[in-house]
Amino acid sequence: MIKKIAFIALLISTTSSFAQHFRTYDWEKNPKLHEINKEEQKESSIAILKKHIVEYVSNVISPEPKLYETEHTIIRVNDDNGIAQHNTVYIPMYEVRKVVNIKARTISPSGKVVLLNQDNIKEVSNVEEYGDFKIFAIEGVELNSEIEVLYTVEKNYEIYGSQTLQANYKVKEAQFLFITGKLESNVKAYRTLETFEEVKINGDNAQLLTIKDIPGMVEEEYATPKANNIAVVYQCFTEGQNITQNMFWTNVSNNVGRQFFPETIVSQATEDVNKIVEGKTDLTNFKKAALVDIFIKSNYTIVKNNNQELSDLNYILTNRSSSDYGILKVYGQYLKALDVEFEIVITANRFLTKFDPEFFVPGMLRDFLIYIPSEKKYIAPDRFEGRIGEAPFNILGNYGLFISSDFEHYFSKIIQEDPDYSRIRRDMNISFNNDFESVKIEQDQDYYGHWSETSRAVLSLSTEQGITEYKDYLTGSGIEDKEILSYEAFNTDMNQLEYNIPFKVKTTISSEELLEDAGDSYIFQIGLVIGTQSELYQETERINPIEMIYPNRYNYEIIVNIPEGYSVEGLESLIIDKSYVARNGEKTAKFESNYKLEKNKIVITIEEYYKTHEFDLNRYEEFREVINAASDFNKAAILFKAVE
């Protein structure tokens, strides 16, 4: 019996440790500073090496393999900002069973090596809601020194995982080593041309991705930098298991379908639906869905916690309180009761994650929408300010998993059905008092699509200060001394039964700073009347693909009344024509302004549009010229000169 126990103990120890790569992987025994070029010396910090190892190890006493992750980084810090960014190390403890080892050291310019004092490693809980961390400060960090960190953790087995290889500083060499031995697995890299190489590690099958000279990710306007990082996703299955991507997606479709497509309508839902449509006839599917959306967002509260009752349909209907997941059950009940066909869409915020239909990772399943196929319109259940219409702008352009009532699924890019959904129409009538002391601007504006949604939400939900700031935007941002003579807004209610009803605003303002005395003449800063404009001026090479918040269009007509006894000069500054022509020959972005003289009036027309939210990175300069054209118009001025 004793021999049997000893044999089992030996078996456990050998099967869980045999050929494990992390046990032999180590840093250089005699470290030296690495060579970096003059340009790299100008950076606050540079990653000499950023290596991540994911190692799945078969375990004969359990069907689940063991999972080890090793992180090895060498960072050169060139200034105080670099030191501040890297001299404290955080090791996430999410799903960590145990810490195998943690090592760190600094190598000074003189070659002095300072090792981490293990007593300095502390454990902190729930750091900014990111979970628990091991944390330690790096000692002995000098300018132009290197910080090297190497640690391994054993984690709870999980089929899926992901790892970001890019950082907000340059990485000279990034490596991702995926060791799975005889286990079935899949791995995929995003946003790089480099591919995985099949290698052997201690006789085990492995795949290695090496990428050199990764530029630091930067925040850029019209971009989704977090979602654009070079990254890896992977899957590794238990012994003898091999699940296809379609099997993963089918499983999700079945589980979600059973939750949100009801077989029967409960009595409380029937009672609610009768109230929703009471006195209303000849309702289209759009109006039915709109009434449901309005009722739910006017009567239910979404609560952010893990209370299981908030996902129970009867509890939700009785208490009018739900989780963002549970509220989908209410939509399902009401829409089915009204015979409105719908589909559930699972997708992700494109500013955070790019949804990939070809590789299943649960981290992509972040956001739910409801799609009404007959109307080609979406409901965003968790967006209190939104109502049925086009897809939310943070989802637009991402792919989604569409699930129908029979639990079948398909993938589709989430597009904007109406190309002119978001647009602004603005008419202005500009006049001057007799002595050119001030200018009066009368404006009539219509805001459609996301513009109208934002306007209604701000005026309905914002603080008094927020409303004041938005009123400033609506009456002419950038005109510092303006006096608001009149202001009236229409269609301000967030609850609209018709598709894309415009938010309207009529205003009258006066300003003195738009005029400048020039002897017997007056300079009128006419460009400022269109409000503050974006400018794209970038000295460094563009990193991110171009993604606008959403497609949009602006159509302005500006009438300037010429005072009697004056002529006008400098009108040529009002003529601008910049465009971006797609590969198929269609203009997909344009800014065009022009004018004509009609007796004592200058009639200025401006047309600016962006028919898509995605533009080619390789043609950034053309896109930039269109964006900057509006800014150029904003600087335009004309001269009123007294007629002799």
What positions do the PLM features span?
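Early extracytoplasmic/domain-onset interaction patches
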Residues: Q20-I91, Q416-N434, S438-Q445
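Secretory-pathway-linked proteins and extracytosolic
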Residues: F22-L33, E154-K170, Q175-N306, P419, ...
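Solvent-exposed beta-hairpin/edge-strand motifs
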Residues: K29-P31, Y90-L116, V171-Y190, V458-Y487, ...
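Cysteine-centered nucleophilic/redox motifs
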Residues: T73, I147, F176, V292, ...
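Surface-exposed, acidic/Ser/Thr-rich flexible loop segments
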Residues: Q85, P92-Y94, G140-L193, E498-S579, ...
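A surface-exposed beta-strand-loop module
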Residues: I102-Q166, E194-N229, D282, N429, ...
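Hydrophobic/aromatic-rich core segments of domains that either
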Residues: G279, A290, Y325-Y410
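Long hydrophobic segments that form regular secondary structure
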Residues: L396, D406-E516
